[in-house]
Amino acid sequence: MAALLVRSVVASVVDPFLHLSRLAVKPRVFSSFLLGTLPRAKPCAEVRSVLCGRPLPTLLPSLGFKTKGVIKKRCKDCYKVKRRGRWFILCKTNPKHKQRQM
């Protein structure tokens, strides 16, 4: 109880001095002192076995637009769309064909 009181008093005294300038950053000594030690939870055996038992699914990266000065249709399924004042090439069969005009 006394430690909590000391922490709150130190925090209230030190805090105004740290906000005097925009570039002031709280020193790690004060922040670690004010936070104290946080209890660490250990995962139980059931959770550990579930996580280790099967591999996590991998996510496929989404493809972005290629930004070009001159855009071209690269296959018969590519089509042009004008959005936000720019021309875009979109393709349903091959997403690698997506292009954006500079």
Curated annotation (Swiss-Prot):
UniProt source species: Mus musculus (Mouse)
Quaternary data: Component of the mitochondrial ribosome large subunit (39S) which comprises a 16S rRNA and about 50 distinct proteins.
PANTHER family according to UniProt: 39S RIBOSOMAL PROTEIN L36, MITOCHONDRIAL (PTHR46909), LARGE RIBOSOMAL SUBUNIT PROTEIN BL36M (PTHR46909:SF1)
UniProt subcellular location: Mitochondrion
GO molecular function, one term: structural constituent of ribosome
Protein name: Large ribosomal subunit protein bL36m
UniProt-listed GO biological process terms: mitochondrial translation; translation
GO cellular component entries: mitochondrial inner membrane; mitochondrial large ribosomal subunit; mitochondrion; nuclear body
InterPro entries: Mitoribosomal_bL36m, Ribosomal_bL36, Ribosomal_bL36_sp
